[in-house]
């Protein structure tokens, strides 16, 4: 998260596949980053209080060469200007450099999913959604941890416990919102490993 060091390896892999196996694939360069809403956190001199608010996940995809340049700029800003425990990106800075980028709402740790999870008012959800170019949903198994024990002594004591029906309802709500706002809704895996045996490394 927040880094793009895999780009050279991805480019080499794609080149090798084409040369050795005749497989031509298109790489979509991007990253999953950490975003926070800096509304109300900018002082008179333009400085941003970037340590006081929690972050959410966000997807930044480069659609053009300008988008690639802006993605690199955002990665640099997040590490050099807004790093606090993790490389953070203020929404205002993303807006300034979003030309050529496609911005997605990410996984359950994304701002949009969390708004539904916390049952925010409809107007607030729509305002949040307006920032994103496309919305994401994932398979129920990806978010099944939200249905696990949240009682005292449980693994997730600070979370509201959901049911499988709740998970389906959130996905349906995101799809409906996408249709209403005419935004694409993408079903993704949010994959972090490629086999059961690799799970331990996460």
Where are these regions (language model features)?
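Phosphodiester-processing cores and adjacent nucleic acid-binding clamps
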Residues: 1-202
């Amino acid at each position: 998260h927040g880094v793009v060091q895999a780009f050279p390896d991805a480019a080499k892999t794609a080149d090798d596949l084409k040369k050795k196996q005749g497989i031509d694939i298109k790489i979509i360069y991007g990253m999953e980053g950490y975003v926070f809403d800096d509304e109300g956190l900018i002082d008179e001199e333009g400085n941003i209080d970037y340590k006081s608010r929690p972050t959410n996940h966000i997807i930044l995809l480069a659609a053009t060469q300008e988008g690639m340049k802006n993605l690199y700029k955002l990665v640099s800003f997040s590490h050099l200007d807004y790093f606090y425990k993790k490389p953070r990106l203020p929404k205002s800075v993303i807006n300034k450099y979003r030309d050529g980028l496609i911005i997605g709402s990410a996984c359950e740790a994304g701002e949009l999913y969390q708004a539904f999870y916390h049952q925010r008012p409809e107007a607030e959800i729509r305002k949040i959604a307006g920032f994103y170019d496309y919305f994401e949903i994932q398979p129920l198994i990806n978010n099944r941890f939200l249905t696990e024990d949240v009682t005292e002594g449980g693994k997730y004591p600070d979370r509201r416990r959901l049911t499988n029906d709740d998970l389906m309802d959130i996905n349906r709500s995101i799809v409906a919102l996408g249709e209403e706002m005419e935004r694409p809704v993408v079903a993704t895996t949010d994959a972090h490993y490629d086999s059961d045996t690799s799970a331990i490394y996460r």
